[in-house]
Design a protein with these regions (language model features):
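Short beta->alpha connector loops at strand-helix junctions that form conserved
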Residues: 27, 53-54, 76-77
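Acidic, PIN/NYN-like endoribonuclease modules and their adjacent C-terminal/linker elements
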Residues: 5-6, 10, 14-17, 31, ...
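Mobile, glycine- and charge-enriched loop segments
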Residues: 1, 19
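Short beta-strand scaffold positions
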Residues: 3-4, 52
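Conserved BB-loop
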Residues: 22-34
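Acidic, metal-binding active-site segment of PIN/NYN-like and related structure-specific nucleases
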Residues: 36, 44, 48-63
Length: 109
């Protein structure tokens, strides 16, 4: 399962679903307004890979907050990109990593 934090636009999550990915969002999980640490803990407790547009999140993970126990983070920047472009980039990244464990990894889309 992919957990799209509150920085990920809902239409991006919907586009990934249309491509067959299991995605839930911070809106659906009612975690809007949570800190990055709380989003990370929420995903870790459920074993969900996190999708984020928030580069502060990278500092949190790279800084050792969750050591190597986090279920994986997929990061991409939304700046200057359309929803369609983002969906394609993220889908392509997910396809390349299909079946591979992302625990402790940060993947850039």
């Amino acid at each position: 399962m992919i957990y799209a934090d509150e920085n990920v636009w809902v239409p991006v999550a919907e586009g990934l679903r249309r491509r067959g990915w299991e995605v839930t969002t911070a809106v659906e999980e009612e975690t809007l307004g949570h800190t990055d640490e709380e989003h990370l803990e929420y995903a870790m407790q459920r074993g969900w890979t996190i999708l984020t547009f928030d580069d502060d999140f990278l500092s949190l993970v790279e800084g050792g907050y969750a050591s190597s126990n986090h279920p994986g983070v997929i990061f991409t920047s939304q700046h200057g990109r359309t929803v369609g472009e983002l969906v394609k980039r993220i889908d392509s990244t997910l396809q390349r990593h299909r079946g591979r464990e992302l625990t402790g990894e940060i993947v850039f889309a």
